[in-house]
């Protein structure tokens, strides 16, 4: 007895899979089957050209979206739907929220897992807040791009006073930053500073709930979140020297990936890159970590030169060392400027200063 005839759908399916037998022409009623398979194949072919790795906080996502939008605007092939994908990665710093950063220990608390994903090929580029990036980069990675720097100043946020100077003695200021803590206590020793972690929204909620009387946040982050109006006032750089690379976004890729390097180089803002390099060299010489209050700021002055200021302090604000430099706005000169300033403060502080911070 001959075998029963195949249904048209089965025949079409085997034909599409490359079956050596084709027993009958697909009937017209099977066209939707072929069309569905074709659409699925086309969708699978649209693989993202760039996968952006980022933390999942609202601010980190805002920075990733800014990067994506700049890439799409600069390169027409990336403007296609799905060409750029954002991949959220949770870092150690995101997972441990009940301890001060200084107590967690180690470097790269907000970058290591993202860099690991980059090296493993799970993402193509990594978007970081430069202030979170250790002074050394993992082997096999490169950071060819800094986006234009945002406002480097800190914002003072309070429901009852317009500035730190107006806070009554004994007022509690919330901050997870030893840099901010040391400078606050140096100028206002009557205030109390307590550990205050969480993303921007969490900290603002805690402030409204009365956990603290005031807090300080990076103005750059508030601006990127369209929340600048949240600031009660803005502290000048003279009042509060910013963190190294504050307000700067850095984008890393694998050092072997020429395609990504070319994409990122097209977005690089050279003035920012040079300023960040100067500040990070200062930090590198001091071998700063989460237990060391360090601040630095390099900028182009009205004459086009680099103006640099650096600070090293004890967490309680009882000891503060400061230095400044001016020189041509040139990469090699600025790196040397940061290095020289770091060595100056390291010598002023002496080895005992750093031993006491361990």
UniProtKB/Swiss-Prot annotation:
Pfam families for this protein: Porphobil_deam, Porphobil_deamC
SUPFAM superfamilies for this protein: Periplasmic binding protein-like II, Porphobilinogen deaminase (hydroxymethylbilane synthase), C-terminal domain
Cofactor(s) listed in the protein's UniProt record: dipyrromethane
Cofactor note: Binds 1 dipyrromethane group covalently.
Assigned keywords, A-Z: Chlorophyll biosynthesis, Chloroplast, Plastid, Porphyrin biosynthesis, Signal, Transferase
Documented EC number(s): 2.5.1.61
GO biological process: chlorophyll biosynthetic process; chloroplast RNA modification; heme biosynthetic process; protoporphyrinogen IX biosynthetic process
GO molecular function: hydroxymethylbilane synthase activity
Signal peptide: 1-24
CDD domains to which the protein is assigned, alphabetical: PBP2_PBGD_1 (cd13648)
A GO CC annotation given for this chain: cytoplasm
Principal EC category: transferase
Note, other: The porphobilinogen subunits are added to the dipyrromethane group.
PANTHER family listed in its UniProt record: PORPHOBILINOGEN DEAMINASE
Family classification: Belongs to the HMBS family.
Biological function: Tetrapolymerization of the monopyrrole PBG into the hydroxymethylbilane pre-uroporphyrinogen in several discrete steps.
NCBIfam families assigned: hemC
Name of the molecule in the record: Porphobilinogen deaminase, chloroplastic
Organism: Oryza sativa subsp. japonica (Rice)
Organism taxonomic ancestry: Eukaryota, Viridiplantae, Streptophyta, Embryophyta, Tracheophyta
């Amino acid at each position: 007895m001959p075998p029963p005839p195949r249904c048209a759908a089965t025949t079409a399916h085997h034909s599409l899979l490359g079956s050596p037998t084709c027993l009958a022409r697909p009937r017209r009623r099977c066209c939707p089957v072929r069309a569905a398979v074709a659409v699925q194949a086309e969708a699978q072919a649209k693989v993202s050209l760039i996968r952006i790795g980022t933390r999942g906080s609202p601010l980190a996502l805002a920075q990733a979206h800014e990067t994506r939008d700049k890439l799409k605007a600069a390169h027409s092939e990336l403007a296609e739907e799905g060409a750029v994908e954002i991949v959220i990665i949770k870092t150690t710093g995101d997972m441990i929220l009940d301890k001060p950063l200084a107590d967690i220990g180690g470097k790269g608390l907000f970058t290591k897992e993202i860099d690991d994903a980059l090296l493993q090929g799970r993402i193509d580029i990594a978007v970081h807040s430069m202030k979170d990036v250790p002074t050394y980069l993992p082997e096999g990675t490169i950071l060819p791009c800094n986006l234009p720097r945002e406002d480097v100043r800190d914002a003072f946020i309070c429901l009852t006073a317009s500035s730190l100077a107006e806070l009554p003695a004994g007022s509690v200021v919330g901050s997870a930053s030893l840099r901010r803590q040391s400078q606050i206590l140096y100028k206002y020793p009557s205030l109390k500073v307590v550990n205050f972690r969480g993303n921007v929204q969490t900290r603002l909620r805690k402030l409204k709930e009365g956990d603290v009387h005031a807090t300080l946040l990076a103005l750059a982050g508030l601006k990127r979140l369209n929340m600048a109006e949240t600031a009660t006032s803005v502290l000048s750089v003279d009042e509060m020297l910013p963190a190294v690379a504050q307000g700067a976004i850095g984008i890393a890729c694998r050092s072997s990936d020429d395609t990504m390097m070319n994409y990122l180089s097209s977005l690089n803002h050279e003035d920012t890159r040079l300023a960040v390099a100067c500040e990070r060299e200062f930090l590198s010489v001091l071998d700063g970590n989460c237990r060391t209050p360090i601040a630095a700021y390099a900028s182009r002055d009205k004459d086009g030169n680099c103006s640099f200021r650096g600070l090293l302090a004890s967490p309680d604000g009882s000891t503060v060392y400061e230095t400044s430099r001016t020189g041509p706005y040139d990469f090699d000169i600025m790196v040397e400027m940061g290095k020289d300033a770091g060595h100056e403060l390291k010598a002023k502080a002496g080895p005992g200063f750093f031993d006491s911070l361990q």
